[in-house]
Regions:
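N-terminal active-site wall of soluble small-molecule enzyme domains
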Residues: 10, 17, 21-90
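Alpha-helix-loop-beta-strand connector modules within alpha/beta enzyme cores
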Residues: 37-55, 79-102, 131-159
Length: 177
């Protein structure tokens, strides 16, 4: 994501610090595991907050937790519950585990899972995801209220967006309170 915007990791970390991001997520769908590992080690050396890796749960020893999308979970096991149980057993209870959710049904399903948070959205369409179906808009509040987990609003969220039932605004993979 940063590459497509011409933003270096150093610039991104500087912005995350300026905006007091408590958690950042490293997401690179195109890189191999060794490259991701090197990037996680580098980020860990320059950022003191929580670092989450997207998808690459095998690399959790280099960060504080893992985030998985619905498709990524189903690639592990068609049964999302089994997939989360497997990933939780691999990453351990001391690591953060979160998943993406897109509607009330997925949020209610996530309530039965051993998670630390959910990402909920998309709130708006974004530059990278223009053709999203199911934009939540203002309904994000009602759906977020159904979650027993901390909620991060994802997809098209801006710094000035305010929500009652959302803990974090996820902006460019940085979670801001």
């Amino acid at each position: 994501m940063l590459d497509s915007k011409g933003v270096s990791i150093d610039e991104y970390i500087t912005l995350a610090k300026e905006h007091n991001a408590e958690i950042i997520q490293y997401r690179n769908k195109n890189a191999d595991k060794e490259f991701i590992k090197e990037q996680l080690i580098y980020i860990r050396n320059i950022y003191d907050g929580f670092l989450i890796v997207n998808d690459a749960y095998e690399l959790v020893e280099y960060c504080d937790g893992v985030h998985l999308g619905q498709e990524d979970l189903r690639a592990i096991d068609e049964d999302v519950h089994k997939a989360v149980m497997l990933v939780r057993s691999l990453v351990g209870e001391d690591k953060i585990l979160g998943i993406s959710t897109h509607n009330k049904e997925e949020v209610l399903d996530a309530n039965r899972l051993d998670l630390n948070y959910i990402g909920l959205g998309a709130y708006r369409s974004t530059d990278t995801k223009k053709d999203i179906t199911g934009i939540l808009g203002d309904s994000i509040e009602d759906i977020a209220a159904e979650s027993k987990h901390l909620v991060g609003a994802i997809g098209g969220v801006r710094l000035d967006d305010e929500f009652t039932h959302v803990t974090y605004n996820v902006i460019g993979s940085g979670l801001l309170k």
